[in-house]
Curated annotation (Swiss-Prot):
Assembly with partners or alone: Part of the 30S ribosomal subunit.
Function: Binds the lower part of the 30S subunit head.
Name of this chain's protein: Small ribosomal subunit protein uS3
Swiss-Prot/TrEMBL keywords: Ribonucleoprotein, Ribosomal protein, RNA-binding, rRNA-binding
Length: 210
């Protein structure tokens, strides 16, 4: 049980760090992180479309992030490594954040979703799924799903081949959740795929949106 509690605690900590970095590094095109324990401490890999923003002038921002990770989140001797995202359109986290930003600027959720889907597919993705959930058009919360192309839905391919990202938009009506899943161009799929040749939109139940 002690081992289980440790892994749960570490998973929660990584989730909280991810949420913090998403807010702090939105302008950098934040695309997620990877935390690894090393003999010298903790290696934190930050993926970003604009690494220069993460580093900051003279390394000021990355030093401040290092202090926060150590003092606020309790990471032991954190060493930050910033890696550039070569194609942000194939990173689900980046796209989820961009859709959330579009919603916060007042862009209609359908327009934001279809624009993102076109950009993702035109950059070579084999498939994409976007779910936008919350009070989208009125008082009743709902979830709308947009999808196109090939996407692994179950099993190991869905876990290892699909890029997944989540972000939130803070609107007057409340919080809007944005989930994005992208199948990259080089993914090699078994039979567990869903094939959608044209863009599709559908409203799903609140239970399915969870």
């Amino acid at each position: 049980m002690a081992i289980e509690r440790y892994f749960i605690r570490e998973a929660v900590k990584e989730m909280l760090i991810d949420e913090f970095l998403e807010k702090e590094l939105r302008r950098a095109g934040y695309g997620g992180l990877d935390i690894k324990k090393t003999p010298l401490g903790t290696k934190v890999i930050i993926f970003a479309a604009n690494p220069g923003y993460v580093i900051g002038r003279g390394g000021r921002r990355i030093r401040e992030l290092t202090r926060i990770l150590e003092r606020q989140f309790g990471l032991e001797n954190p060493q930050i490594d910033v890696q550039e995202i070569k194609n942000p359109y194939l990173n689900a986290k980046v796209q989820a954040v961009r859709i959330a930003q579009a919603l916060e600027r007042g862009i209609h959720f359908r327009r934001a979703a279809y624009a993102a889907m076109r950009a993702i597919m035109s950059n070579g993705a084999r498939g994409v799924e976007i779910r936008i959930s919350g009070k989208l058009t009125g008082e009743r919360a709902k979830s709308v799903r947009f999808y196109q192309g090939y996407l692994a839905k179950v099993g190991n391919p869905a876990e290892t081949l699909v890029s997944k990202g989540y972000a939130q938009a803070l609107l007057k009506l409340g919080v809007i959740g944005v989930k994005v899943a992208i199948m990259p161009p080089d993914a090699r799929l078994p039979d567990e795929i869903e094939i959608i040749e044209k863009p599709v939109e559908e409203e799903v139940s609140s239970n399915e949106a969870e």
